[in-house]
Amino acid sequence: MRELTAREPLATLPGMPEDASAAALTEQPPLPYRVVLRALIRCAASTMRLLWQRRMHLPARHVGTRLRFADGTAARVYRETAIDRGATRDPCVLVVEFRLRAVRGRGHAAFRWESMLNTPLFGGFPGLVSKMWLADDERGRYRGLYEWDGPERAEAYARALWRVLALVSVPGSIHYIVLPGLRRDELMERPQVLPGTGPAAAAWWRPVAIS
């Protein structure tokens, strides 16, 4: 992950405040290992509670949907995870990408199957609303498309997730972006709400068509 400190400006999206909070949260350095370890322990405990309370679900609505991105690649949704929770007060979309190390051919199918076991590593993070799991694209990159309640919470998760992904990913292939003020379903229904010019014109994270 590149250690970026600048915030990438976006066009104002529907429902977004017209101030600095409308800027995308771009990549920051990963969190320290000790912070990540504590966060993962809390997350695993919260995930177990959600499962016990039957508040975590695997909706089938979007499974099989194909997303085409501005960089010319496309990927299929192979799983969705959703959390029963209260109203989302500060919605945002988080998009993460990575490329697995030394995985080829049938290895991708095996990863998609076993990735269900990774649920305790993300399901209990504060603010999670939903996650769509996207299969590998033409360049071998996986993506996660999340809705989160709170951009800062989403960013904290992404910076913790980096440490986990780094264990199995090609160096330099892990990236994320947080898009404040946007709901995932809005993005799925109207991908044109995102700007099509400037840095976003050919961005790996910007959906341009849904089928």
Model regions and ranges:
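Short, non-transmembrane amphipathic alpha-helical segments
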Residues: L161-L165
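Short, well-ordered beta-strand segments in beta-rich or mixed alpha/beta enzyme
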Residues: V93-F98, S130-A160
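A general secondary-structure junction signal
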Residues: A135-D137, V178-L182
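Amphipathic alpha-helical interaction segments
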Residues: F122-F125, E155, V168
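Short S/T/G/P-rich N-terminal loop/turn motif that feeds into the first structured element of a domain
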Residues: R2-F125, P180-S211
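Conserved short beta-strand edge segments in small beta-sheet-based binding/regulatory domains
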Residues: A166-P180
